[in-house]
């Protein structure tokens, strides 16, 4: 990339002294509620983003005030598992140190806080540290939170898969001590000129974000093919023997720029469990060395594979890993949803999956979700498992404790709501008012939109059919809308692009059907299509497959060539 000018972020990383920048000085300044432009990029590596309340932006401008700056902090919780004691700490932070007084479960199996004033950042990070939690590398050009199927039934297999996810997360953490020095007040250690501070990442880290997931078939709740790097567990007689490795997935794109596109990962082959770290490091270092550092819109691993070619990339990964891929093993990729209600595991323990609409845990009249989870955490002896569908599993409940846990869940509105198949399979990103990238609503509007979808399905007698519906406020794709049977991507206030045709299992992308349309047009279009689907569908045919089969949209086979075509 020496012939091209590097992206600004590359210079920022190079000059940052391994992610220190002037964050400490900015934190100490009370003149403004923000950080400098450069530090706003660096703080992402520490786990948070600078935001402002866009609902108040114009009003404050008229008053000649700076925007109402706040921060969104995202924790690193590999596999989404935390203890009840940790959850109580997480809850206390939300209640005392954020203006949102809420916890947001994310589509990557962790939680985030919104509405943090700059003065509270350090206190929050130190409080998380006391709970053995952190936000290191939850954002930024590094390996993000590692997802893992929270399968509450195959407990032994889940334990083995989770151990791999946890090891991946720990092994691929940045080594810089910037986080410990700035936020935890640890002493800066003296280093020599030739000392390797970041043995995997190097001084400029990765060209762009890097997302990783471990799936346990037949479940695909982690949407493994949408990740930069995926590991699909292969078991024999209930024991983990290895993984099918996938690489090159990613959701983000830019409206109107056809050289950007979402993409599902390629299958590369089977690897043994003992070789996982070799291959993970090999894939990451190829991306580190080959990835585009001039154009951040084309810097994800998916573009590296497209630009260099599958075979060339595969050969380089094998060379760096020192191991060849074996032929991919046969596995069945199935449902992406969660199992709601009580499920008994093979170990005799029970697991209660609670639906949390759009992942927002907050006390509201008639639904005191935050208090309910707090009360459960006080007595629960198992663990809490966050899912990539923004839900919560109260896992490892003894049979004799079921009634007490269920009673608390019902008392606080965590159980008892009527949940349609489609609502249970649908997710939305945060969007307005806090996300600076949002062009339209998502989380705040989504429940009402799903009400309309439910009504249309009932009208046409297809309520029993789960349809994966996802909404985002922009095309960056945090809620993985391009892998939804019905995807809505914000284009402007109240206007969305409508995408159709993804597979129910997450093995095929969707394609744009209508551009820049409002709610009335979206619902009219879906009303017509649901009517056709009710009459014309084959036995067992999902909605996404139906829209492709009857020619409503063309199947996306090679995203680089036909997502936009």
UniProtKB/Swiss-Prot annotation:
Enzyme class, UniProt record, top EC level: oxidoreductase
A Gene Ontology molecular function term of the record: NADP binding
Cofactor annotation: siroheme; [4Fe-4S] cluster
Residues the entry annotates as binding siroheme: 478
UniProt-listed GO biological process terms: cysteine biosynthetic process; hydrogen sulfide biosynthetic process; sulfate assimilation
Cofactor: record remark: Binds 1 siroheme per subunit.
Top-level taxon in the UniProt lineage: Bacteria
E.C. no: 1.8.1.2
Record pathway: Sulfur metabolism; hydrogen sulfide biosynthesis; hydrogen sulfide from sulfite (NADPH route): step 1/1
GO cellular component, one term: sulfite reductase complex (NADPH)
Binding site for [4Fe-4S] cluster: 429, 435, 474, 478
Enzymatic reactions: hydrogen sulfide + 3 NADP(+) + 3 H2O = sulfite + 3 NADPH + 4 H(+)
Keywords recorded for this protein, A-Z: 4Fe-4S, Amino-acid biosynthesis, Cysteine biosynthesis, Heme, Iron, Iron-sulfur, Metal-binding, NADP, Oxidoreductase
Subunit structure: Alpha(8)-beta(8). The alpha component is a flavoprotein, the beta component is a hemoprotein.
Protein's job: Component of the sulfite reductase complex that catalyzes the 6-electron reduction of sulfite to sulfide. This is one of several activities required for the biosynthesis of L-cysteine from sulfate.
Similarity field: Belongs to the nitrite and sulfite reductase 4Fe-4S domain family.
HAMAP family listed in its UniProt record: CysI
Name used for this protein in its record: Sulfite reductase [NADPH] hemoprotein beta-component
Lineage: Bacteria, Pseudomonadati, Pseudomonadota, Gammaproteobacteria, Alteromonadales
Gene name for this UniProt entry: cysI
């Amino acid at each position: 990339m020496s012939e091209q000018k590097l992206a600004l972020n590359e210079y920022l990383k190079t000059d940052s002294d391994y992610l220190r920048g002037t964050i400490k000085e900015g934190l100490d300044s009370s003149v403004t509620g923000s950080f400098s432009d450069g530090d706003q990029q660096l703080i992402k590596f520490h786990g948070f983003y600078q935001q402002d309340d866009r609902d108040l932006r114009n009003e404050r401008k008229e008053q000649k005030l700076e925007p109402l700056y706040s921060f969104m902090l995202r924790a690193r919780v590999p596999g989404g598992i935390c203890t009840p004691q940790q959850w109580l700490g997480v809850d206390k932070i939300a209640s005392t140190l954020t203006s949102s007084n809420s916890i947001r479960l994310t589509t990557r199996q962790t939680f985030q806080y919104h509405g943090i004033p700059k003065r509270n950042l350090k206190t929050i990070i130190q409080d998380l540290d006391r709970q053995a939690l952190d936000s290191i590398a939850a954002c930024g050009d590094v390996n993000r939170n590692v997802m893992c199927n929270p399968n509450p039934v195959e407990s032994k297999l889940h334990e083995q898969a989770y151990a791999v996810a946890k090891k991946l997360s720990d092994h691929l953490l940045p080594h810089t001590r910037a986080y410990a020095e700035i936020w935890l007040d640890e002493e800066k250690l003296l280093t020599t000129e030739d000392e390797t501070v970041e043995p995997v990442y190097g001084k400029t880290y990765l060209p762009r974000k890097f997302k990783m997931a471990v799936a346990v078939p037949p479940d695909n709740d982690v949407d493994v093919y949408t990740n930069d790097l995926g590991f699909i567990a292969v078991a024999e007689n209930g024991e983990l023997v290895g993984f099918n490795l996938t690489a090159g997935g990613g959701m983000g794109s830019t409206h109107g720029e056809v050289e950007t596109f979402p993409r599902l990962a390629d299958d590369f082959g089977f690897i043994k469990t003992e070789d996982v770290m070799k291959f993970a490091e090999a894939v990451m270092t190829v991306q580190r060395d080959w990835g585009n550092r001039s154009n951040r819109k084309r810097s994800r691993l998916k573009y590296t594979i497209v630009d260099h070619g599958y075979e060339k990339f595969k050969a380089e990964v094998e060379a760096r890993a020192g191991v060849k891929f074996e032929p991919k093993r046969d596995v069945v990729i199935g449902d992406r949803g969660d199992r709601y209600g009580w499920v008994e595991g093979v170990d005799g323990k029970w697991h209660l999956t609670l639906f949390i609409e759009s992942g927002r845990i907050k006390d509201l009249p008639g639904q005191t979700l935050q208090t309910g989870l707090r009360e459960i955490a006080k007595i629960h002896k198992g663990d809490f498992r966050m899912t990539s569908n923004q839900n919560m599993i109260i896992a490892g409940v003894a049979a004799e404790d079921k009634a007490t846990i269920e009673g608390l869940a019902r008392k606080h509105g965590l159980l008892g709501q009527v949940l349609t198949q489609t609502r249970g399979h649908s997710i939305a990103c945060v969007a307005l008012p806090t996300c600076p990238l949002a062009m339209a609503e998502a989380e705040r509007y989504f429940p009402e939109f799903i009400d309309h979808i439910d009504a249309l399905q009932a009208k046409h007698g297809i309520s029993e059919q789960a349809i994966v519906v996802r909404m985002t406020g922009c095309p960056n794709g945090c809620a993985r809308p391009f892998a939804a049977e019905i995807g809505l991507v914000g284009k402007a206030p109240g206007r969305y692009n409508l995408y159709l045709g993804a597979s129910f299992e997450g093995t095929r992308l969707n394609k744009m059907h209508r551009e820049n349309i409002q709610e009335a047009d979206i619902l009219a279009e879906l009303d017509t299509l649901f009517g056709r689907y009710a009459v014309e569908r084959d036995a067992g045919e999902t909605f996404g497959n139906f829209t492709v089969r009857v020619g409503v949209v063309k199947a996306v086979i090679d995203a680089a060539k036909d997502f936009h075509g």
